[in-house]
């Protein structure tokens, strides 16, 4: 039986996300899922092949409905072999398509993270103190709004190694200063551009909606500016602090499926993400506009 209990002591998908861009022999991509299949259903089915330590099903950010695919992490790699040895897998009346999760080739282990939902009132010293508890920090970037010359509601933290990033990603949200912040791996802008080029060939993604009223109070202002920044460049950052993945084209969360026809499952919903085009990193080394912009994914 699985060790994946009803109330796990980690966030769903956190153990899967902790090793993004790295080959993990116990990790699988599961395609062709019925919209009615739940995480529990998928976990129970795959548990017959070995102990499942993490499982996540991706959902549409607008409707909350399953997008028909997910990821699973087995405790032992031999379980993956057992799954693949079985010619046919049927769950909730549908043939499902399990595959090894293949990490994108040529990508270095992540050392830089994006911190979203950060109050501009949080001092640099507070940021150093919190993130320094996970490992040695190489650099902290605090983007400024070029129009107001005020801090934006997010920052970037670069470590000297990859281990601190793994530790951070074990939890999706972190309490930093007075707010609850979301942590994501920062991705080079050129990678995002490549994804956008692929997306344009397959059609446009979800429409960009505009957020609520334009409040000017400092308490709401920074948070709203952060949400607007996401709406325009990255995706939807809900009022409840949750971020919903927007979609992917031939690659997902650091995994390469370029030879796989996701269109048959209706997965190709496009990427929308943060590009950093409006920000200058006053704290970045060298000053001025930061040439190697990053965005989370």
UniProtKB/Swiss-Prot annotation:
GO cellular component, one term: cytoplasm
Region (Disordered): 1-21, 192-224
Biased composition (Gly residues): 202-222
Main location: nucleus
Residue ranges occupied by any RRM domain in the UniProt entry: 26-108, 111-190
Domain of life: Eukaryota
InterPro entries registered for this protein in UniProt: hnRPDL_RRM1, Nucleotide-bd_a/b_plait_sf, RBD_domain_sf, RRM_dom
Protein's job: Acts as a transcriptional regulator. Binds DNA and RNA.
Name the record gives this protein: Heterogeneous nuclear ribonucleoprotein D-like
């Amino acid at each position: 039986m699985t060790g994946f209990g009803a109330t796990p002591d980690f966030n769903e998908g956190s153990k899967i996300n902790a090793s993004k861009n790295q080959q993990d022999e116990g990790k699988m991509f599961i395609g062709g899922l019925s919209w009615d299949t739940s995480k529990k259903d998928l976990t129970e089915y795959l548990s017959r092949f070995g102990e499942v330590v993490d499982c996540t099903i991706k959902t549409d950010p607008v409707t909350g409905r399953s997008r028909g695919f997910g990821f699973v992490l087995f405790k032992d790699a031999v379980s993956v072999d057992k799954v693949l040895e079985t010619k046919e897998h049927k769950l909730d009346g549908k043939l499902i398509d399990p595959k090894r999760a293949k990490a994108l080739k040529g990508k270095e282990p992540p050392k830089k993270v994006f911190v979203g939902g950060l109050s501009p009132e949080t001092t640099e010293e507070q940021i150093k103190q919190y993130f320094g508890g996970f490992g040695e920090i190489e650099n902290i970037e605090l983007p400024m709004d070029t129009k107001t010359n005020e801090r934006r509601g997010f920052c970037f933290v670069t470590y000297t190694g990859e281990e601190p990033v793994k530790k951070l990603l074990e939890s999706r949200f972190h309490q930093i200063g007075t707010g609850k912040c979301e942590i994501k791996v920062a991705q080079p802008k050129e990678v995002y551009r490549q994804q956008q080029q692929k997306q344009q060939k397959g059609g446009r993604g979800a429409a960009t909606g505009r957020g609520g009223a334009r409040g000017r109070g400092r308490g709401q202002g920074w948070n709203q500016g952060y949400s607007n920044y996401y709406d325009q460049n990255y995706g939807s950052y809900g009022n409840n602090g949750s971020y919903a993945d927007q979609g992917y084209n031939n690659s997902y969360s650091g995994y390469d499926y370029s030879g796989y026809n996701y269109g048959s499952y209706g997965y190709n919903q496009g990427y929308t993400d943060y590009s950093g085009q409006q920000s200058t990193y006053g704290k970045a080394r060298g000053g001025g506009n930061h040439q190697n912009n990053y965005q989370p994914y």
